[in-house]
A protein has these predicted regions:
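A short helix->beta-strand "capping" segment at the edge of beta-propeller domains
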Residues: 6-30
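Hydrophobic core register within WD40 beta-propeller blades
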Residues: 36, 75, 117, 154, ...
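Conserved beta-strand element within WD40/beta-propeller blades
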Residues: 43-47, 83-87, 124-127, 161-165, ...
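WD40/WD-repeat beta-propeller blade N-cap
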Residues: 25-33, 65-73, 107-115, 145-151, ...
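Short loop/turn segments that connect beta-strands within beta-propeller blades
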Residues: 56-60, 96-100, 137-140, 174-178, ...
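Beta-strand-rich domains and repeat architectures in extracellular enzymes and scaffolds
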Residues: 25-50
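Blade-level signature of beta-propeller repeat domains, shared across WD40, Kelch, NHL, RCC1
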Residues: 285-311
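Short coil/turn segments within WD40 beta-propeller repeats
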Residues: 31-34, 49-53, 70-73, 89-93, ...
Length: 311
């Protein structure tokens, strides 16, 4: 098992000034907008009102689905456009197009809070507040892994499961052929949320990003096997308050949180990333996701959805 220490701090390179809010939804969720996901030219937002709203790329409202009776924690979308959502009542639902009330089905219900979900192709990963990660394929449970600590954010790729709460990112290697067996591959100081991003190399994302333990700094580590999760850079205190949300793609990383800012970063494989600037959202950032044409979508505590561009 690899336990990584802290790298040298990287200073932030000069900021560009192209960041702006392109679109804002004309209506919002009742209460917080809690999560966003993008697929097939449509944006999906979940809220404290239990609804999933579906938007055009320009944030024109297409439809509203009554997905849950209570607060939606998170969403994930698989390669076929199946939308999974979890709520504070312990239920996980899913739906396929056409996205409407009658399409909502129950995957499972439990007494635990499913606070994190992730799709890798057709495989769904769910993580709960008791530290249990469950893998699903074709809506059938494959394995359960008891990782002990509450799962606030997770990702999965090939035989690796990435989980985090508030102190450490844990990378677990699934033992092939043994139900629920795993070994710890690496432990990295940091807290939620976590994100796999960067170019794909033999089916694996090049980078893993997550905040430091303060919650206000960002760090990026190598995710490819030969590099053993070595740090690329670390940016302490690049936000004034705790980071709640990150998203990214092959070239860019975006981060937002309680400071009501969304910030963009590029040149990710350099010794220090280059800042793309920031936008003032005007409300706490709860969730972000990448869309098409370098658009970034923001779910915030005022219930509204915004679209920002940095390029």
């Amino acid at each position: 098992m690899v336990r990584m220490g802290c790298p040298q701090f990287a200073p932030i390179r000069p900021m560009a000034n192209n960041a702006r809010i392109e679109h804002t939804s004309t209506e919002g969720h009742e209460g917080d907008a809690t999560c966003v996901a993008y697929f097939g030219g449509q944006l999906f937002s979940g809220g404290a009102d239990g609804k999933i709203r579906i938007w055009s790329p320009q944030l024109e409202l297409i439809s509203t689905v009554n997905a849950h009776e209570s607060y939606i924690y998170c969403m994930a979308v698989n390669q076929h456009g199946k939308i999974y959502s979890s709520s504070c009542d312990g239920q996980v639902h899913f739906m396929l197009p056409p996205y409407e009330d009658s399409a909502v089905q129950e995957l499972f219900r439990c007494h635990d809070a499913i606070q994190a979900m992730y799709c890798d192709g057709s495989v769904l990963y769910t993580g709960d507040d008791k530290g249990v990660v469950t893998t699903w394929s074709n809506d059938r449970m494959l394995f359960k892994y008891s990782l002990v600590e509450e799962v606030k954010s997770l990702a999965g790729e090939q035989k690796l499961i990435y989980t985090v709460r508030d102190l450490d990112v844990v990378v677990s290697l699934v033992v092939e052929g043994k139900s629920g067996k795993y070994s710890n591959k690496a432990v990295l100081p940091g807290k939620s949320p976590i994100l796999l991003l960067g170019p794909l190399v033999e089916g694996k994302r090049s980078f893993l990003a997550f905040p430091d333990r303060s919650g206000m700094g960002l760090q990026l580590v190598n995710n490819l096997p030969q590099q053993q999760f070595s740090h690329i850079w670390r940016l302490p205190n690049c936000h004034e308050w705790i980071v709640n949300a990150i998203c990214g793609d092959e070239k860019y990383l975006y981060s937002g949180g309680y400071d009501k800012k969304l910030k963009g970063w590029t040149d990710l494989d350099a010794a220090q990333p280059r800042s793309l600037g920031e936008v003032d959202v005007g409300s706490c950032v709860n969730s972000v996701c990448c869309g098409e044409n370098n658009m970034v979508y923001i779910a915030s505590s005022d219930g509204f959805i915004r679209a920002a561009k940095f390029i």
